[in-house]
Amino acid sequence: MTVPLILASGSAIRAQLLENAAVPFTKDVPRVDEESVKAALLAESAPPRDIADALAEMKARKISDKHPGAMVLGCDQVLDFQGRLLSKPDSPETALAELKQMSGQRHMLLSAAVIYENGQPVWRHVGQVRLRMRALSDSYLSGYVARNWDSIRHAVGGYKLEEEGVRLFSTIDGDHFNVLGMPLLELLNFLALRGVIDT
């Protein structure tokens, strides 16, 4: 019998990525205080890559404790802007200020995934994407935030590339799935190796 896969996430886009790839899974959303963990790691000068990995692992571990024998997938995405971690904006004003700072600049998205099985990590990967934002006018950015706030409030950096946010960028260097928050190709390779999916 195949080991079941559990997605430890409430993210609709991550669930959709697995569904689109025909990966059988169930969801169990962990209740974790991400902001406290992030703050503690930042206080220790942890780099953004390590923070993404630690948050993904924390989610997988929490759900793995409830489901022995299952493979539990935890994911997290962070935005590294000039060595500074940007999170989901807490207000339209924050989103606008951060977008103005990133206008005309490069930043990096780091998408971490960790699989736990029987209380132990068995696989992990952090994918990275480098993005360059166009030089955008303040009036365009103000309108963009006003039009898209209900959606972008749930996205690191205040944009979604699968929506109007794609217009903010001049170049994107990296895997599209990592932009969406999951290193899907690497995950599928591991699941095929373990016999969770047919190849």
UniProtKB/Swiss-Prot annotation:
InterPro entries: ITPase-like_fam, Maf-like. It is found in: Cytoplasm. This is Nucleoside triphosphate pyrophosphatase. Belongs to the Maf family. One of its GO terms (molecular function) is nucleoside triphosphate diphosphatase activity. Nucleoside triphosphate pyrophosphatase. May have a dual role in cell division arrest and in preventing the incorporation of modified nucleotides into cellular nucleic acids. Its EC number is 3.6.1.9. HAMAP family: Maf. It comes from Ruegeria pomeroyi (strain ATCC 700808 / DSM 15171 / DSS-3) (Silicibacter pomeroyi). It holds the Pfam family Maf. It catalyses: a ribonucleoside 5'-triphosphate + H2O = a ribonucleoside 5'-phosphate + diphosphate + H(+); a 2'-deoxyribonucleoside 5'-triphosphate + H2O = a 2'-deoxyribonucleoside 5'-phosphate + diphosphate + H(+). The active site is at 76 (proton acceptor). Its cofactor is a divalent metal cation. It comes from the Bacteria. GO terms for cellular component: cytoplasm. Keywords: Cytoplasm, Hydrolase, Nucleotide metabolism. GO terms for biological process: nucleotide metabolic process.
